[in-house]
Regions:
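Core catalytic lobe of class I
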Residues: 1-304, 309-311
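Positively charged, low-complexity nucleic-acid-binding target-recognition regions
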Residues: 1-2, 157, 319-331
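Conserved SAM-binding loop
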Residues: 314-315
Length: 331
């Protein structure tokens, strides 16, 4: 076993319950283009294919887990309603521009009826909910349950209007209150709110805890999405398609996996949405690029690959890459 890498051969559905709570999930599964064994013939049934996985992600993720969802444009369009239904909040559609090298020598522009495709999308979502309730709705609903006027929330927080304008608003000005302010809302609501509705802003874990503020801080940490944006990055990633030594090939020299992602891209995703020690899931591992990136950057990886050929190749690659990393560190 490789330290901090928990990689399984089989269907991720059989392993999710054994995995630690993820800070980030990197999904690179079926595309509906018949691109590999197990892929669907077209995009029409992708929503059904992904839904069982989305259900488990939603059940087991943290309150503000980040999801990176790779697919084609039409594939993502088919799966987006399922993600939204299960509480995932859309953040940004990123485009991987693979460059002309991706189609050079493989397209005949005289016979094409559309532009050659050199891109795929990677869509960023955050969980943004408590259970299946978006946190924005949860906070406002809890306050409304108290029967107190909204302006009393400002009094509770000791602010002029930040509570009503930001913490309890229904519009785009919303942001999650700092833990100290959330604790003030909770205490005020439970002291002055309708006694029949108590407790407010709490769950069984919080209510049973004798250190309510510490528990609130712990829960707040799970509610805040992590994102560290490099100064030179946008939502268009111009990275050439894989070739050379990084591209894994079979014994005949042919590309082994048609959907292998560049490690440079995986590093960017992992570093931008996690910190050292965080957990990363890769449910459709392929050659485990996201998992390797996670481990070499000090994260903990959980992944699965259903095709034993890809799994074995991915494990060999993982082991080789880790040995290389150790040698580099020694010298």
């Amino acid at each position: 076993m490789i330290e901090n890498a928990h990689l399984y051969c089989g269907d991720a559905m059989d392993f999710y319950d054994q995995w630690a709570t993820p800070m980030t999930i990197v999904s690179d599964g079926a595309y509906g283009i018949d691109g590999f064994d197990g892929d669907l013939k077209n995009h029409e049934h992708l929503a059904d294919w992904y839904e069982p996985h989305v259900v488990k992600w939603s059940e087991l993720c943290g309150t503000f887990t980040t999801l990176w969802f790779f697919n084609t444009e039409i594939g993502w369009a088919n799966v987006h309603p399922v993600l939204r239904e299960h509480g995932w909040k859309y953040v940004r559609c990123c485009v991987w521009d693979k460059g002309m090298g991706h189609v050079a020598g493989r397209t005949n522009t005289r016979t094409l009826n559309q532009f050659p495709c050199v891109s795929e999308v990677c869509v960023q979502y955050i969980r943004g909910s408590i259970g299946n309730i978006p946190i924005q709705n949860y906070l406002r609903n809890e306050w409304m349950r108290t029967g107190l006027p909204l302006n009393k929330a400002n009094e509770a927080c000791g602010v002029k209007n930040a509570a009503t304008r930001k913490y309890l608003t229904t519009d785009s000005c919303f942001y999650v209150p700092p833990e100290e302010q959330l604790a003030k809302l909770r205490d005020y609501a439970n002291e002055h709110g309708n006694p029949e509705g108590r407790p407010y802003f709490g769950d069984e874990v919080v209510e049973q805890s004798r250190s309510g503020i510490d528990e609130m801080k712990r829960r707040m940490a799970l509610r805040l999405p992590k994102f560290h944006c490099p100064a030179d990055m946008t939502n268009v990633w111009s990275l050439p398609h894989l070739s050379g030594d990084e591209c894994v090939r079979d014994e005949n020299g042919k590309v082994l996996h048609p959907n292998q992602k560049p490690l440079e891209m995986m590093d960017m995703l992992i570093k931008s949405s996690t910190d050292e020690g965080d957990v990363v899931w890769e449910p459709f591992g392929g050659l485990f690029s996201a998992s390797f990136s996670a481990v070499r950057n000090g994260r903990i990886a959980y992944g699965a690959e259903i095709d034993s050929r890809y799994y074995d190749a991915g494990m060999r690659r993982f082991d080789e890459k880790m040995r290389e990393a150790v040698q580099i560190a020694l010298f």
